[in-house]
Amino acid sequence: MRTGRVIVSVLVVVAALVAGCSGASDDAAAPTVRGSWHGDIEVPGQPIAIGVSFAEDGSATIDIPAQGVRDAPLKDVRTEPDRVEFTIPDAPGDPGFRGKLDGDRLTGDWVQSGEKAPVTLQRGKIENLPRPQDPKPPYPYRSEDVTYRNGDIAIAGTLTEPEGSGPFPAMLLITGSGPQDRNEELMGHRPFQLLADTFTRAGYAVLRTDDRGVGGTSGTLDDATYPDLAADAAAGLAFLRTRPEIDPARVGLFGHSEGGYLAPMVAALPGSDVAFAVLMAGPSVPGADVLIEQNKVIMASTGAPQGQIDQQVAYVSEWSRLLRAGDIEGARAFTQRHNDSLPVAERAPQEVVDGFNTPYMTSFITHDPKPTLQALRVPVLAFFGDKDQQVIATQNEGPMRENLAAAPDATVHTFPGLNHLMQPTATGKPSEYATIETTIDPAVLTYVTGWLTQRVPPR
C-alpha cells in the first residue's frame, strides 16, 4: 500500500499545479544546471515522466505531460551542483525533488509525505505525448473566433462551418465539470476540437466556447450556478441563430459529462427550441449519487481497503446532505473539520477546501436531472463507456432509459471497453487518460455522426 500512496500523492499534486501556483527563489541558476531536463519519477509499475526547466533568474518550472501539467512554477529552487532542489507549492505533503548534479545527469529522490521515489533526469526538453487525432490544417472548412454576451458575461469561442452558403444545421458543445477551455483540453487531449472537426466535416456548424473565467470568457466559474451556466448555453444558441448561414430550426446541443446535466436544462428553457440533444457520459442521477459512486469505484480500483472506502463515502454523504439541506455554512464547517483532522502531510490546500462549498459545487451536488430529462421532446442520443469510473454506466444507463421514455426518438447506448473520455482503456482509471494516444475512439465518432445524419441530415 505504500507504493499506492506514492502514486496517489503524485496525482494529488495536479490539483495544486492546475490551480496556478507560483514562486521561486532569487538564487541565480548555476550554468551547469540551468536549462531543460527530463526523466521519470520511478514509481514501481507506473513511472511518471517529468520535465524541469531552470531559468537564468533562478526560477524553475515543471511539466508532467501524463497529468496535463505544463510550465507550472516551482518554489524553494536551489541549483548548486551538489544540492539541486525544488518544491511544488501549496500541494499536500510538500512534494519536490532533492538531489545533485551527477555528471550529465541530475539524480536524487522525489520526496512527498515522508516517502521517496528515485528520479534521474537528463538534459533536454520532455517530449509531448502523441495525439494522432489532433486536427491539423489546412482544414476543409471555415473557422472563426467569435464573442457574444449573456448579460454581463462575455463569452468567447470558435465557430467552425462547412464551406458553402448553407443553411447548415448547427450544434453547441457544452463542456464537463471544472474550468475548461473551448477544446475541453485535459491531459494533453482536446476532445472538443476533435468533435468540432468531425462534425463540421460531416456538414454541421459547431460552436465551442471557453467556460467562465477561462480563455476569453469573463466571470468566475465557482460563483456560477447551473441556471447561470444554462443561460450561457442558451446565449450560444441565440448567437448561432443570428448567423444567416445557419438554419435556426436545426440547432442542437452536445453535452459531455456535466454538459449532459446542462443540455436538458437548456432545452427546457422557454424559447430554446432545441432540435436535438447528444449526451456523452451525461449523468442521469443526482450529483451527490454520482460523486459517491465515483469515489467507491475509483478508490476500489486503486486498492484502497474497504474501511477507508466506507469512511470516504460517509464523509461525502454527510457533506452532500448538508448542501442539499441548504446548510452551506454547516457544509463549510464540516469540510474544514474533516481536513483539519487529517495528518498535516495529507491535508488539502485551503483554497481546495474552500472550493468544496461554492455555488457551482453546490449546484452539482444538489442537481437532479430527472425532471429536465423527462421533459425532452426531441431526438436524444445518450451514450456511456462501460469502463467509465466518473459517470458509472451501470448506475446511469437504466435511469437514463427510464427518464427518456417519453422522448419521441431516444437512443441509449453503452460502448464496451471505453472510459469517461470514450478512449479505449484497460481499466478506466482517470490516471490513464494522458497515457492513451486515442482522444476519442473512432467507433464513437462514426456512431454519433451516423445518428446525427439520420435525424438532422445536412443539406
How would you label these PLM feature ranges?
Residues 167-177:
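Short beta-strand element of the alpha/beta-hydrolase
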Residues 223-244:
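Alpha/beta-hydrolase active-site loop
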Residues 29-101, 110, 133, 140, ...:
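Central antiparallel beta-sheet cores of small beta-barrel/beta-sandwich binding domains
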Residues 378, 389-403:
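Short alpha-helix in the alpha/beta-hydrolase fold that links the catalytic acid
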Residues 376, 382-384:
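Short beta-strand/loop motif that positions the catalytic acidic residue
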Residues 196-216:
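Conserved alpha/beta-hydrolase
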Residues 126-166:
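N-terminal cap/lid segment of alpha/beta-hydrolase-fold proteins
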Residues 276-375:
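Accessory cap/linker subdomain of secreted extracellular hydrolases
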